[in-house]
Amino acid sequence: MQHPVAARFTWGENWELFSYVRNLRYLEYYTNKRQMPWDKVLRAYYWLKHRRNIAHTGISIAPNCVGPGLHLVHRGFRRLGARSTWHIGSFCTCLPNVLFGKKNPYVGDEGFYIGDNCYIGAGTVILGPVHIGNNVTIGANSTVTKNIPDNCVVAGSPAKIIKYK
């Protein structure tokens, strides 16, 4: 596993993930800034490139939902921030096969909140709306259905607090 900045100087899986996140940040920039005519063209270009990257990598991250320092470790299915009310904090590490979903699809559009410095293990399912605190580690193949406080380690299906950091 390489550092995300070092990945830009290599080819392969890490380059694709770095390119995905970089394109996502460009899309966020052109979405949020004042729209001049040429900015609309660039936003459309980065949106189409983002859609192509979703099909190519299997990762779906909505613009303006993820804080800085997102670290994607391997390619694989991830669905993060499909709604604008979802927020994933800074310096979050997310492994493959992570799914964010609703407990009940007919309930209102309440959001997720994932705090800063979180580690989300492979195969994790987070059914919300939930609030996950800062510095939380979620073990592999866990199912999170309830709020998690700051500074703890959770695992299991359903996820239970194993220990506090």
PLM features: residue spans?
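Terminal amphipathic alpha-helical/low-complexity segments used for targeting or macromolecular assembly
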Residues: M1-T57
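Structural signal for interior beta-strand "rungs" in well-ordered beta-sheet cores
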Residues: A55, I59-A155, A159-I162
